[in-house]
C-alpha cells in the first residue's frame, strides 16, 4: 500500500513527491536494501546514541511516548523515530526533542534519494535512512525507535546493538506481510531480539510466550516478561511497578485507557533493564503525566469539527484499526457514557478486519456513521454500515467526518476511529496538528 504525504514547504514537497513515487509492495520487507542504502550514506545507524527498540501490534507508539517522557523528565535529550505521521510528515522524526524542521527534512530526504539509484528502496526505508542520518549528526542521550511493521525484517532492525528491546501488546494485523496466526506474528515481532540484550515483554498466552522465547533463545537474548520478571498493578488512581529489588508507584497515565497503564509499566521495565542511562524514580513517576501520544483516546478541543456537535457532547479520536486495539477503546467508551448516546464515526482501510473491529466495539456503541478514508483504498462506507447492522447497530453513511457529526442532534459521546489516516484528517480539520 502506497503511503501519502504532503507539506506546505515547497522544498519538502519536492522530496515527498519523489518519495511517494516509491511503491512499498509486499515483497520489500528485508534488510538488504536498507543495508545497502545506509552503506552509501556512511552507515549512520552505527553512530546512533543508545537505542531503545520497540515492537508490538498495539501500544508500541504509546510505550515510546512513555520512554521519551521519562527520559525528558530526567533532563535528557532524546531522538524519536515513529510512524505513520498523522498530519505532517515531520512527526515521524523527532530530533533532540523537537520535530525535524523543514530545511533539515528536505535536505536529508534529498541526500538519501540521490544515492538510491539501483537499490529501489521503499518509502519506509528512505524515511528510516533519513532519520538515522539526522540522529547520527545531532547529539542526544538516547534514540527511541518504533518498529514500522513486524520486526525481524523491518528496516529499523538494521540496528544491531540496541541497549534494550521491547514488545508491546500483540494481536492480528498486517497479515499479508507477517502471517495469519498470532503465533507467527509474535515470532516476527521477537525478531528484534539481539544477543546479550534484554528483550522486555508483556504477558501473552502460552503459545505466544513460547514462540517469543524460542526466537529470543536463538538470538541469545534474555527475555524479561511481565508476570514473571516484573509486574504491574493498576488501581483507581495509581500504577505500581515492581521487579527484583525495586518498586515505584506512579499516578495513572493521563493517556486514557487501562491499557496505557500497562504501556507505562513496559516502558519502566525497559528503562530498568538497560545500562546506558540512569533514570531516577522521580522521572519514572513523571512519565505518567508527561507522555503525549495524539489520536490515542484523545479528547479533541473546541474547534471547527468539535463545535459541530450539540452542547454537552464530547468528540474523541482514536486510531484503533484492528480488533485487539478496539477492545480497550470499547472499555473506555463504557466509562464515558454517563447516560449519553455513543456515536462511532468510522472509516477503515480495505486491508483491515472491519468486521472484527465493529464486533468488539458493538457493545459500547449505539450508532455507527461510516465515512471514506480520503486518498487510500478503504472499505466502502456502505459496506461498513452493513457490517455494523449485522452487529445490531443503527448505521448510516456520510461523505465526511464533518457531515457525519452534523447528523448528531443530541448530547453524545462521539468517537472517530478506524484508521490513523482518518485520525490525521480529523486533527487537521479541527486545528490540532501534533507538535
Task: Please describe what each predicted stretch is.
Residues 404-431:
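A glycine-rich beta-strand to alpha-helix segment
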Residues 121, 126, 139-147, 162-251, ...:
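Acidic, Mg2+-coordinating active-site environments of NTP-dependent enzymes
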Residues 202-224, 235-238, 272, 311-317, ...:
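C-terminal helical cap/extension that packs against the catalytic core
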Residues 1-27:
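Charged, amphipathic alpha-helical linker segments immediately N-terminal to NTP-binding catalytic cores
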Residues 11, 25-27, 31-49, 72-160, ...:
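ATP-dependent carboxylate-amine ligase catalytic core
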Residues 62-66:
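Hydrophobic positions on the alpha1 helix immediately C-terminal to the Walker A/P-loop
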Residues 48-50, 142-145, 153-166, 170-173, ...:
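Nucleotide phosphate-binding/pyrophosphate-handling subdomain across enzymes
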Residues 52-54:
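Hydrophobic anchor at the beta1->P-loop junction of P-loop NTPases
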Amino acid at each position: 500500500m502506497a503511503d501519502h504525504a504532503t507539506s506546505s514547504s515547497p522544498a519538502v514537497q519536492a522530496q515527498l513527491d519523489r518519495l511517494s513515487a516509491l511503491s512499498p509492495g509486499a515483497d520489500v520487507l528485508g534488510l538488504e536494501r536498507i543495508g545497502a542504502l545506509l552503506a552509501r550514506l556512511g552507515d549512520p545507524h552505527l553512530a546512533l546514541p543508545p537505542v531503545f527498540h520497540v515492537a508490538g501490534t498495539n501500544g508500541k507508539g504509546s510505550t515510546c511516548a512513555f520512554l521519551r517522557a521519562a527520559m525528558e523528565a530526567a533532563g535528557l535529550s532524546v531522538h524519536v523515530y515513529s510512524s505513520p505521521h498523522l498530519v505532517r510528515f515531520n512527526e515521524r522524526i523527532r530530533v533532540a526533542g523537537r520535530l525535524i524542521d523543514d530545511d533539515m527534512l528536505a535536505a536529508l530526504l534529498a541526500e538519501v534519494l540521490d544515492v538510491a539509484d539501483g537499490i529501489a528502496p521503499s518509502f519506509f526505508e528512505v524515511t528510516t535512512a533519513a532519520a538515522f542520518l539526522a540522529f547520527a549528526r545531532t547529539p542526544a542521550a538516547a534514540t527511541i525507535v518504533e518498529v514500522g511493521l513486524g520486526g525481524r525484517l523491518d528496516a529499523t532492525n538494521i540496528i544491531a546493538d540496541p541497549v534494550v528491546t521491547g514488545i508491546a501488546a500483540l494481536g492480528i494485523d498486517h497479515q499479508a506481510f507477517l502471517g495469519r496466526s498470532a503465533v507467527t506474528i509474535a515470532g516476527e515481532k521477537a525478531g528484534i531480539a539481539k544477543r546479550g540484550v534484554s528483550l522486555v515483554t508483556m504477558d501473552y498466552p502460552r503459545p505466544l510466550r513460547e514462540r517469543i522465547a524460542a526466537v529470543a533463545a536463538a538470538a541469545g537474548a534474555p527475555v524479561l516478561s511481565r508476570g514473571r520478571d516484573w509486574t504491574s498493578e493498576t488501581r483507581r488512581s495509581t500504577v505500581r511497578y515492581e521487579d527484583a529489588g525495586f518498586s515505584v508507584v506512579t499516578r495513572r497515565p493521563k493517556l486514557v485507557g487501562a491499557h496505557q497503564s500497562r504501556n507505562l509499566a513496559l516502558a519502566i521495565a525497559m528503562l530498568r533493564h538497560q545500562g546506558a542511562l540512569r533514570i531516577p524514580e522521580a522521572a519514572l513517576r513523571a512519565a505518567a503525566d508527561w507522555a503525549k501520544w495524539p489520536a490515542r483516546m484523545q479528547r479533541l478541543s473546541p474547534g471547527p469539527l468539535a463545535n459541530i456537535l450539540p452542547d454537552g457532547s464530547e468528540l474523541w479520536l482514536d486510531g484503533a484499526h484492528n480488533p485487539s486495539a478496539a477492545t480497550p477503546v470499547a472499555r473506555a467508551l463504557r466509562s464515558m457514557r454517563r447516560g449519553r448516546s455513543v456515536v462511532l464515526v468510522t472509516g477503515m482501510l480495505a486491508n483491515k478486519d472491519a468486521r472484527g473491529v465493529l464486533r468488539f466495539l458493538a457493545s459500547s456503541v449505539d450508532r455507527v456513521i461510516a465515512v471514506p478514508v480520503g486518498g487510500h483504498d478503504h472499505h466502502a462506507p456502505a459496506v461498513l454500515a452493513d457490517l455494523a447492522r449485522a452487529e445490531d447497530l443503527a448505521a448510516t453513511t456520510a461523505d465526511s467526518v464533518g457531515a457525519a457529526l452534523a447528523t448528531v442532534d443530541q448530547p453524545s459521546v462521539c468517537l472517530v476511529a478506524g484508521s490513523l489516516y482518518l485520525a490525521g484528517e480529523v486533527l487537521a480539520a479541527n486545528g490540532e496538528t501534533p507538535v
